[in-house]
Amino acid sequence: MSRLTCRRGGAVRAAWMILIGLSSVLPSSPRPATGADVAAGLRADVVATGIPRPIQLALDPLGGLVVLSPGWRGDAAAEVYRLDLRGPLPVDAARAPRVVIPFADESRKTVFGSLAVDPRSGDLFLGEENGNRIYRLGADQRLQAVAVGLNHLLGGSALALDHQGRLVFLDYASPETNLRSESPLPPSLSWLIEEGYQGPLVFRIDPREERRLPRRADLLSPILPRGAAPRPAREPQWRLISVTAAAGDDLVFLSSVGEVLRLGSDGELRLVARLPAGHYHRTNLAMGPDGSVFVSGGFHIRQIFRISPAGAVSTIASELGDPGGIVLDREGALYVAETALHRIIRIAPLR
């Protein structure tokens, strides 16, 4: 067990690398993912087991699968696994290395619920679920605050990296979310929130800029809404709960009511498709190479959808065990974290 030194907003935190013997991994082939119902022409195989409640997935620059987990005991902010899927499958993650990130030494014990990986540096970006901060875990094994002062950061793909390595993250402005912020306004100033803009907020920052970190979200100018925020003459927009980067500077979002929307370079938010009605919570998005969008509906929906570039919605998998994070590899295979079953499955065309 080797210690990793990590920093959190100036305070030193400790993370632990748990190294468990990698021997005794028996050669095997991927086995069919029982219980998962996939569309015709596809198959689902189990590629990793023994991961306690995997909630987020990403690929590192070498093609390894990065998995975010809360751990078995719930006594840490997160556990991070890095799995090499080029060998015998399924991988027994109980025998794989993992990084354990402990809670901060303060009263709040917030877990990490969102993950993005810089495809160039391999740095991990970790967001607090139902929290206010985003961190970067770099190759130097230090945990550094990147953004603070959010009102309410959700889990799932509430943050993402675009094609230029800029960090995009979602927030929401309302009297209720202000109460969850790190520095809520006192009751005497609550009218500033009630009479101001209420609705989704989208921010984009470049962590590599020569500017001091962390950035304060409450002092940043959002890219949505852009310019002067609209006055509350109508009902606030639905909350944006997931984001992924599309071609160019475009971004694709999922709203809390199942709307798939696209934000173009002109600043206009356009409806792409509507998913079936349901409770969308801890959802995740992934962009296909042809411009299609994959949506993991979360543990209430238990389905994965594909939205074609033309906006047609199809279901590619259902009856999943609490689907969480999703990611596409270079060959177009879709990896899915089945949180309730403590495993990762791969959905790919039949061969």
Language model features: what each stretch is:
Residues P323-R351:
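Blade-level signature of beta-propeller repeat domains, shared across WD40, Kelch, NHL, RCC1
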